[in-house]
Amino acid sequence: AEALNDSFCSAEEIDEDIDNVNTYDEDLNDDFISNGSVEDTEVFSSQMEAYSTEEDDSTTDGWTPLKKEPKISFKYDSETQTLSFKASEPCALPDTVSNGTRSDWYKLNKEVGNASTVIIGDNITKIGNLNFDNRKSSYPNLKNVVLAPSVKMIGRSAFYELSALETINLESVTSIDQASFAESGLKALNFNQSDVSIGVNAFADCESLETVNVKGLTYIGESAFESCSKLTSFTCDSTIPQLSSAVFKGCSSLNQINLKAVKIEDYAFINCAALSHFDFSETENI
């Protein structure tokens, strides 16, 4: 019986063992802290904080800098459906990579797809390629575009297939790239510069376009106004070096054209049934 009793620990011994275990845990915890766990935790916490704010680049006034061009910021007002851009110094809106992809600002805020008005502010010099391309129905409601005088260039397919687009001020623009406004809903165009270049298919299939007034043209590309079936009047104040092939092809309502061209290429006026007069006084080659 005495041997059996010796095999059990007394209450005092049990308490002593528990104290030893607690002391061991405290020592282990001290070792854990001394090995840098607190520092690691602080680093981890700071990384998590950075991660949590990484997607929220907007400032308190609602302007968000573009990732591809931080000098430009944008803001969208959902109440007025207005998408605005501003720049801290002269720079261009970055090109959209390819057809069907989204612009930098669209990726940051998909609400911009509801915009009815776009305002391009001072210091922005160019609208990039495919910026407002509507082939993916990215901007189905876009009706008005307001450009600052700093905007001189419109990139390739920048406003392609915007059938709702009715107005844009191009008075300060000197360069319109390929298919920039093809299949858009524009009704009138006015260029006030004397050195305007209009690219291939720039306004092709603009079925609502009625009048075009240009102070001076240095270049007008093939099919630039092809199939603008409601175009009735085209005026250019200076002599154009060359009217490219099919430039007014299918402009069936064109009846008033005030321009002179040194060279007129093939099919420039094919299927222009309403056209009855053209001044060939400075034309050297047809």
Where are these regions (language model features)?
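Intrinsically disordered, low-complexity regions enriched in Ser/Pro/Gly/Gln/His and often acidic
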Residues: 54-57, 97-99, 174, 224, ...
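Structural signature of tandem-repeat unit edges
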Residues: 18, 30-31, 36-42, 80-90, ...
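Consensus positions within tandem repeat domains that build extended binding/scaffold surfaces
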Residues: 129-131, 155-158, 177-180, 200-202, ...
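LRR flanking "cap" motifs
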Residues: 65-129, 133
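Residues in intrinsically disordered, low-complexity segments of regulatory proteins
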Residues: 62, 104-105, 138, 233
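N-terminal regions of proteins, emphasizing targeting and processing segments when present
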Residues: 18, 22-25, 37, 42, ...
